């Protein structure tokens, strides 16, 4: 069995040319410094590796970042339309952290390593950007998270690298209980008790 080699971003010339094309203060959803960019020479199947960083004001920064990986590679702006409990940007900004998201390099059926390499290089360049923005040398603590398909990506990022993230939270992992047939008990309750009966159960179960 071939042993997996730990990936070290600093040794990969493929990601050696990061760039920033937007850096501006924004007031929505909360005041933050927005940074957008990518890595030159990383285009594959028409998609270049790109990233977005969202930095809180200096007095609110506590030396950490949160990085989200979605179930499927999407636009690096994907978190900007989220609201309420799903608003990951606001959560990071109000918890002393800057927020990191990449487009994961886009969809690729032939390069399974592109995801964790894109995520790792996004995280590391985010650290360098944080040092520049906040004006002092430090290593921001990093935490990566993702649900459903993103849970596997979170584990991949943690397992295939070392020293990039200090913790990871994979959630709603796919397993036998996550298959569609587990919805059948709910449907049976609705069939036997009717829609009103199901509403009563939900009402009693909610806090």
Listing of model-derived features with the role each one plays in the protein:
Residues 165-207:
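A catalytic-pocket lid/entrance helix-loop region that shapes and gates access to the active site
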Residues 69-70, 102, 145-147, 170-171:
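Generic beta-strand/beta-sheet core signal
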Residues 62, 67-135:
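Cap/lid segment of the alpha/beta-hydrolase catalytic domain
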Residues 136-148:
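Alpha/beta-hydrolase fold nucleophile elbow
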Residues 151-162:
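Short glycine-enriched nucleophile-adjacent loop
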Residues 1-63, 86:
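Catalytic-loop region of hydrolases
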Residues 95, 161-164:
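Short, structured coil segments at secondary-structure junctions
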């Amino acid at each position: 069995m071939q042993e997996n080699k730990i990936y070290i971003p600093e040794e990969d010339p493929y990601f050696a040319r990061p760039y920033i094309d937007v850096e501006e203060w924004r007031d929505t959803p909360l005041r933050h410094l927005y940074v957008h960019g990518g890595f030159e020479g990383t285009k594959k199947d028409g998609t270049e590796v790109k990233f977005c960083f969202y930095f809180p004001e200096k007095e609110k920064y506590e030396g950490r970042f949160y990085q989200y990986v979605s179930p499927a590679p999407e636009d690096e702006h994907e978190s900007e339309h989220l609201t309420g409990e799903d608003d990951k940007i606001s959560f990071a900004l109000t918890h002393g952290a800057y927020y990191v998201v990449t487009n994961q390099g886009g969809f690729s059926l032939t390069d399974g390593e592109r995801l964790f390499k894109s995520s790792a290089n996004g995280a590391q360049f985010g650290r360098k950007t944080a040092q520049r923005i906040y004006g002092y040398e430090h290593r921001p603590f990093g935490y990566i998270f993702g649900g459903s398909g993103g849970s596997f990506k979170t584990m991949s990022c943690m397992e295939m690298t070392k020293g990039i993230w200090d913790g990871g939270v994979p959630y709603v992992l796919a397993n036998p209980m996550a298959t569609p047939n587990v919805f059948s008990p709910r449907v049976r309750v609705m069939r036997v008790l009717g829609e009103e009966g199901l509403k009563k159960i939900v009402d009693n179960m909610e806090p």
